From Swiss-Prot:
Residues 282-385 are annotated as: Receptor-binding (R). This is Colicin-Ia. The lineage of its organism: Bacteria, Pseudomonadati, Pseudomonadota, Gammaproteobacteria, Enterobacterales. Residues 276-308 are annotated as: Disordered. Keywords: Antibiotic, Antimicrobial, Bacteriocin, Cell membrane, Membrane, Plasmid, Transmembrane, Transmembrane helix. Its main location: membrane. InterPro entries: Channel_colicin_C, Channel_colicin_C_sf, Channel_colicin_cen, Channel_colicin_N_sf.
Amino acid sequence: MSDPVRITNPGAESLGYDSDGHEIMAVDIYVNPPRVDVFHGTPPAWSSFGNKTIWGGNEWVDDSPTRSDIEKRDKEITAYKNTLSAQQKENENKRTEAGKRLSAAIAAREKDENTLKTLRAGNADAADITRQEFRLLQAELREYGFRTEIAGYDALRLHTESRMLFADADSLRISPREARSLIEQAEKRQKDAQNADKKAADMLAEYERRKGILDTRLSELEKNGGAALAVLDAQQARLLGQQTRNDRAISEARNKLSSVTESLNTARNALTRAEQQLTQQKNTPDGKTIVSPEKFPGRSSTNHSIVVSGDPRFAGTIKITTSAVIDNRANLNYLLSHSGLDYKRNILNDRNPVVTEDVEGDKKIYNAEVAEWDKLRQRLLDARNKITSAESAVNSARNNLSARTNEQKHANDALNALLKEKENIRNQLSGINQKIAEEKRKQDELKATKDAINFTTEFLKSVSEKYGAKAEQLAREMAGQAKGKKIRNVEEALKTYEKYRADINKKINAKDRAAIAAALESVKLSDISSNLNRFSRGLGYAGKFTSLADWITEFGKAVRTENWRPLFVKTETIIAGNAATALVALVFSILTGSALGIIGYGLLMAVTGALIDESLVEKANKFWGI
């Protein structure tokens, strides 16, 4: 028959395949690995074809099997094939599950491919593309791993079918010719299985090659440090694979614990029944005597009608009652190990059967008394045997209970170890997830900052287009001087503004003031808020603003009334830390979201300059002279 098919070491993290031994070991591919559980068996010891002596191609010549031989072989083959069938069913169930995982892996791989195409088409960051490329490599390896697993299951199926045919050929009910036909079918199936072995071995070798590429790629990423998320993704995927394996193992361990617990309960019930049976045997009258003859003597008695006919003098019928009593341990032990005759002679010291002239009658009476002791002896022997058998059953049940208790302990320990491993994996995953979240936050921050800087740059270009190159230069200088500074206090700002008030007022009439105020009142706060966040990030301000609408309202009032103090006071209250950069971001946001003309632009820059640096007010004042 064929060599045994076996798949070993299902929890290993390395891959191995021996086409001669048909060994497949599970693989860690940073994801859910191919998993093939132990499947093994050896051809039965009775398997051979030497029991068929061929003559004429299809007849028995000698050593023909007996009916007993045939029935015995039938039972052996049936038991063997039942085992193979159970293994085959389990194998098919696992192949079905692997097929489902393969379908999911294919869908995931296709999704990753589409995501990568989208990133490339959208000119995404190199780090995002690198990360997605690595994800795709993982998805491709996962898919190939499940295809490899299925190939292993297919090889196992063919090997099992071959062995079933070989087993059928071993039947003693079929002719050598029929056996030969089955053997030919089995050998063909075995050849198919060997080809499947070769295919699985080649796939596993290719799997290792691809895994090596993935490992190399990961090492490069770790060494270069340029794709932290890709590395973290790989670590996360590895842990998720371990988590999936652990979850399966926990499920199996729980099933095992449930099974052994059921066996333990069965063992307890069996022990209870055995103990009840023992108690029942000990509580029978003869059982009580076996346990305590002093307390419960064993008794037997029989009425006899003995016919005497040999000697005319004593001819007739003798009516007697024979009795036997055991009331101590020594006598009980002797009777159980000797005959009734021995007991009568040696314990009762009654060796002479003839005590009167009626020889025939005396002998018959003596024999009846011996028979009474034999009768009691047999009853007590039966009782002792039943008690011994019951005690043996109790001991066996206790041993079985002890074994099942140990088995439950081991199953429980195994489950607890897996649960501990689950918690460890969960903690590691939590740490990795936090790192991924932090890395994503950093990348999002970096991306948002880049976008904000670009947004600020585009704004300055728009200032040039709308108000002229000198207006852009003024805005750039204001942004530059504001960095690292705090806004000036109210009195300083008012003093500076008063210095240039007359010049400023020469440039602005009442109509201009009304137009500027109207432009400010028409701005959309939602647009201002959105732009403010981007300008703040672009200019390096990380604080928050409060009462934005109030500030714009105060500015409009100040434009109309020429009373700037309330505005300067409000500015101190809405800007956290009094950062000058924040004020610049606010002003830029208003310029972006309003319809201010060049006069309004100059006034806004002059007022802002008074809160930052006097030189900016001077430059704003000169700006009007353009």
